[in-house]
């Protein structure tokens, strides 16, 4: 679907960079979720970095996920920044 996630990358401080199929890009902060249920496991930074995409949703190996609708509603858009600057953030974890 048009709101599926097409790219995700871990960032410092429990944030992720996401790109949505419709072209939106943003930074999603997971800190508010880290004390809830199965998402507690994401506090392990090495595990957090194993983020991926399954069926258009952001996921981790033990079945934690963030729905695209939640990402879109709560992410901080980065559309006003050049794409290459965010590629550097993703590649270098700055």
Model regions and ranges:
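Motif-centric detector for short Cys/His coordination patterns
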Residues: 1-94
């Amino acid at each position: 679907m048009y709101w599926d996630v097409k790219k995700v990358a871990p960032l410092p401080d429990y944030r992720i960079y996401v790109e949505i199929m419709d072209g939106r890009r943003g930074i999603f902060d997971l800190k508010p979720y880290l004390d809830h249920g199965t998402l507690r496991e994401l506090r392990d930074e090495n595990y957090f970095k194993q983020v991926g995409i399954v069926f258009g949703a952001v996921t981790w190996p033990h079945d934690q996920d963030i729905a695209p609708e939640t990402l879109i509603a709560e992410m901080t858009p980065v559309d006003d920044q050049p794409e290459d600057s965010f590629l550097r953030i993703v590649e270098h974890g700055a």
